[in-house]
From Swiss-Prot:
Family the entry assigns: Belongs to the bacterial ribosomal protein bL12 family.
Organism, as annotated: Acidothermus cellulolyticus (strain ATCC 43068 / DSM 8971 / 11B)
Organismal lineage: Bacteria, Bacillati, Actinomycetota, Actinomycetes, Acidothermales
Keywords, sorted A to Z: Ribonucleoprotein, Ribosomal protein
InterPro entries: Ribosomal_bL12 (IPR000206), Ribosomal_bL12_C (IPR013823), Ribosomal_bL12_C/ClpS-like (IPR014719), Ribosomal_bL12_oligo (IPR008932), Ribosomal_bL12_oligo_N_sf (IPR036235)
NCBIfam families membership: L12
GO-annotated molecular function: mRNA binding; structural constituent of ribosome
Function: Forms part of the ribosomal stalk which helps the ribosome interact with GTP-bound translation factors. Is thus essential for accurate translation.
PANTHER family: 39S RIBOSOMAL PROTEIN L12, LARGE RIBOSOMAL SUBUNIT PROTEIN BL12M
Designated gene of the protein: rplL
Subunit-structure text: Homodimer. Part of the ribosomal stalk of the 50S ribosomal subunit. Forms a multimeric L10(L12)X complex, where L10 forms an elongated spine to which 2 to 4 L12 dimers bind in a sequential fashion. Binds GTP-bound translation factors.
Gene Ontology terms: cellular component: cytosolic large ribosomal subunit
Name of the molecule in the record: Large ribosomal subunit protein bL12
Length: 130
């Protein structure tokens, strides 16, 4: 098998859809036993809170999945919203909407997830963020 250069790999990735890239990352992680998640620095507790039990500390979720539960009555508007949020083509976006419940975005920050949820709900879809 020919060895691909970094530039050739980047060009190949540019041609993939968001869902295809997500699947690639999952398989890469499984194959090599690694994770693509950025390391998260744990903030030290203030000295005043030193007596508090560590179980009381609640770690805020950093990555969210936006799940399309139902397209609702305005399916065309939902397909348009999905296309705006992702790099999917018309057929892929339609297949995603028809196959609900399905993830629209995976492992995104809270701000992106909230914006996506608002856009999809504005189009008439039922959406959950996990």
């Amino acid at each position: 098998m020919a060895k691909l250069s970094t530039d050739e790999l980047i060009e190949a990735f540019k041609e993939l859809s968001l869902l295809e890239l997500s699947e690639f990352v999952k398989r890469f992680e499984e194959t090599f036993g690694v994770t693509a998640a950025a390391p998260v620095a744990v903030a030290a507790a203030p000295a005043a809170g030193a007596g508090a039990a560590p179980a009381e500390e609640v770690e805020e979720q950093a990555e969210f999945d936006v799940i399309l539960e139902d397209a609702g009555a305005q399916k065309i508007q939902v397909i348009k919203a999905v296309r705006e949020l992702t790099s999917l083509g018309l057929k892929e976006a339609k297949d995603l909407v028809d196959g609900a419940p399905k993830p629209v975005l995976e492992k995104v920050n809270k701000e992106t997830a909230d914006k996506a949820k608002a856009a999809l709900e504005g189009a008439g879809a039922k959406v959950t963020v996990k």
